[in-house]
């Protein structure tokens, strides 16, 4: 079944509201055709629609969705694509403020762990898709699904690597073991000012089509109805692309 919730964290610490903090830095008119502009990087409506189409195609191909995809599901998937970009900007800024560097090797290590974990999860189904599709499908099956599209798995892995670096840095400063559940409250307290500072520094604009801002909670509230309606042709095209990718053995 298609569903999406805020991006899961690789670290043991889960910060409720970490995503929401980033949405406070916004304003100004949207560029034509833009779904979001995050730190000056423009993501188009077409890109988001393609990502949503690829998720729908993946879950339908693997019989996870019964019946038609609802407006609420489409809205959640569209918002999830934007939320991932905001997450990336927030944690990248936090890492930069702390003087931390996350390398491509760190990203590769994180993605490799995700692929190994998620392929094991799908093992009983003898999943033959690409590594990125395996991660996206395992995400779709989980109770904490974040609405990952196969094409955004590398971004997701980078976000996890950023989170891990920032959490470990704050844990070291506070002389805390980040893997000890008893330290979660203390780590949350240590991370809060870091994320608040980062949230005030990033620049985020989101199209009202994907929701609206609640100033009282600094959260993006999803639109009640979704304008994202992938056509059968778009879903079929996404299916063909996935099949072609599987045939070539690519991610």
Regions found by a protein language model. Give the residues of each.
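Short, mixed-charge aromatic SLiMs
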Residues: 106-123, 181-206
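Proteostasis/folding factors centered on peptidyl-prolyl cis-trans isomerases
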Residues: 126-174, 179, 192, 205-209, ...
């Amino acid at each position: 079944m298609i569903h999406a919730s805020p991006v899961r964290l690789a670290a043991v610490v889960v910060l409720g509201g970490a995503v929401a903090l980033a949405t406070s830095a916004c304003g100004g008119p949207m560029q034509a055709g833009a779904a979001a502009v995050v730190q000056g990087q423009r993501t188009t409506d077409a890109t988001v629609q393609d990502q949503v189409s690829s998720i729908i195609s993946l879950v339908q191909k693997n019989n996870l969705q019964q019946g038609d995809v609802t407006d609420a599901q489409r809205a959640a998937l569209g918002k999830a694509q934007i939320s991932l970009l905001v997450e990336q900007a927030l944690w990248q800024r936090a890492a930069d403020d702390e003087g931390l560097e996350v390398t491509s090797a760190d990203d590769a290590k994180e993605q490799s762990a995700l692929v190994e974990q998620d392929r094991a999860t799908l093992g009983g189904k003898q999943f033959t898709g690409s590594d990125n599709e395996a991660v996206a499908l395992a995400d779709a099956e989980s109770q904490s699904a974040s609405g990952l599209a196969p094409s955004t798995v590398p971004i997701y892995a980078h976000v996890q690597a950023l989170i891990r670096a920032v959490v470990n840095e704050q844990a070291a400063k506070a002389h805390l073991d980040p893997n000890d559940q008893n330290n979660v409250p203390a780590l949350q307290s240590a991370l809060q000012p870091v994320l608040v500072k980062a949230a005030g520094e990033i620049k985020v604009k989101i199209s009202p089509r994907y929701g609206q801002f609640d100033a009282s909670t600094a959260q993006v509230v999803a639109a009640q109805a979704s304008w994202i309606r992938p056509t059968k042709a778009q879903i079929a095209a996404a299916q063909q692309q996935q099949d072609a990718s599987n045939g070539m053995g690519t991610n």
